[in-house]
Amino acid sequence: MKQRTLSIIKPDALKKKVVGKIIDRFESNGLEVIAMKRLHLSVKDAENFYAIHRERPFFKDLIEFMVSGPVVVMVLEGKDAVAKNRDLMGATDPKLAQKGTIRADFAESIDANAVHGSDSLENARNEIAFFFAARDL
C-alpha cells in the first residue's frame, strides 16, 4: 500500500554533509521525496514535536540536540513507506543497527543518530501535518 511518512535528517548528519547520501538511500529503495525543507527548529517547536517524550529522562538532551543546528524535514512516499523507512534507518542505537542502514553508516550515538522517522501511519500523518500544509504535498 502506498503510504507517506515523515523523515528528519538531524543536525549531526548535516554537519557531516551526508544529506545527499541519506536521500539517495531513500530514493534508491523506492521512497520518493514529495516535500522537503531545511530549517532550524526553535526550542518550542522541538518540544511540541517531541511532546510524547516530555516525561522521559532524555527529553532535555533530545531538545538541545535537535535545536543545535539545522535539520532537513521530508515527506517520503512509497509502498509501505513507514516500515521501509524504519528498516532503512536501522536501530535507534547505531551500535545495534545492522550494517548498511543509515544509522550504522552515518550516526555516532543513540542521541546523535542521524535521522528520525515516523513509527506508525497515524504518527506519520500527525508529524507530516506538524511541518507541512496540505498544499505543500
From Swiss-Prot:
One Gene Ontology biological process: CTP biosynthetic process
Gene3D superfamilies, per database record: Nucleoside diphosphate kinase-like domain
GO molecular function, one term: ATP binding
Annotated Gene Ontology cellular component terms: cytoplasm
Active-site residues (renumbered): H116
Cofactor dependence: Mg(2+)
Matching PROSITE patterns: NDPK, NDPK_LIKE
Subcellular localization: Cytoplasm
Cited Pfam families: NDK
InterPro entries: NDK-like_dom (IPR034907), NDK-like_dom_sf (IPR036850), Nucleoside_diP_kinase (IPR001564), Nucleoside_diP_kinase_AS (IPR023005)
Catalytic activity: a 2'-deoxyribonucleoside 5'-diphosphate + ATP = a 2'-deoxyribonucleoside 5'-triphosphate + ADP; a ribonucleoside 5'-diphosphate + ATP = a ribonucleoside 5'-triphosphate + ADP
Similarity field: Belongs to the NDK family.
Subunit record text: Homotetramer.
Functional note: Major role in the synthesis of nucleoside triphosphates other than ATP. The ATP gamma phosphate is transferred to the NDP beta phosphate via a ping-pong mechanism, using a phosphorylated active-site intermediate.
Name of this chain's protein: Nucleoside diphosphate kinase
Organism, scientific name: Helicobacter pylori (strain Shi470)
Taxonomic classification: Bacteria, Pseudomonadati, Campylobacterota, Epsilonproteobacteria, Campylobacterales
Gene field: ndk
